[in-house]
């Protein structure tokens, strides 16, 4: 029953994106980031119960199958146009499979503060990918908004993080390089998805996501079978695994991935990546609300810079015609 309600909620959110109300779309962007920020804790729980690659593969395959079921119920076309086959395979390998594998391996050797800082560069990599793939122009005003976002990140990490700044290590080792690579590949994947949505209008974003998730999930499970111990499967706590995977599939794969993909039809990947910088701030809120952690003192300042940067980028992209009020 909970899963059915969540799926109905996801469909409602995705429908609202294309109503001619930009305020509602902006609200959905930040609501999506708010929901997505819970996936870190859920992923940690899942990895406590099973091997990381098996977790990734299981959730991707399960989510893809559920999406295919929803599309069949809605009687949407699942036929892949020939020009879309290779881009979807590329999206599956780069945007889903490699991104998740590199992220999981890199996070095992990094502190949360360093990981958050590296993820803070995603709007810059998204802007570069948009320039290369979609020929979207990066203006000085947009760079100013991105810089404000970076300032907000520095304020949050220096004055609002949960770890002592003195404990930070700034050496560039293998974990840092893996996470930087995951950030770049993720930005490339979202830009490729936006490009696919433009060129293959006969195929819905949900269908593209379904194909990409199943392909990436199968690759992850094959990788897991080669590198992780299956006896008979790499799961130590079946109940916790099922609970965590179920929550991840519903909140991350079904709601957030698909809503983000829908939003890419109306907004650039640069703007959406910038808005997703608030995810660590929302994670701090969850920590304060659910775990009783102290409220970070730099949080309000970071949010203030984030709002200013968001307005700059939004108005500039609206002027450039990259923001659509309706489809």
Swiss-Prot record:
Q: Which InterPro entries match?
A: AA-Vitamin_Transporters, EamA_dom
Q: Which UniProt keywords apply?
A: Cell membrane, Membrane, Repeat, Transmembrane, Transmembrane helix, Transport
Localization annotation = Cell membrane
Residue ranges occupied by any EamA domain in the UniProt entry:
34-157, 189-313
Does the record carry Cell membrane as a key word? yes
What's the main place this protein lives?
Answer: membrane
The record's listing under SUPFAM superfamilies reads: Multidrug resistance efflux transporter EmrE
**GO CC, any one term:** plasma membrane
Positions of transmembrane segments = 22-42, 53-73, 85-105, 114-134, 143-163, 165-185, 202-222, 240-260, 271-291, 294-314
| A Pfam family hit | EamA
Recorded topology in the membrane: Multi-pass membrane protein
Q: What does this protein do?
A: Transports S-adenosylmethionine (SAM) and S-adenosylhomocysteine (SAH). Allows bacteria to acquire SAM from the eukaryotic host cell and to likely remove the toxic by-product SAH.
Q: Which family does it belong to?
A: Belongs to the drug/metabolite transporter (DMT) superfamily. 10 TMS drug/metabolite exporter (DME) (TC 2.A.7.3) family.
> What is this protein's name?
S-adenosylmethionine/S-adenosylhomocysteine transporter
Tell me the organism. Answer: Chlamydia trachomatis serovar D (strain ATCC VR-885 / DSM 19411 / UW-3/Cx)
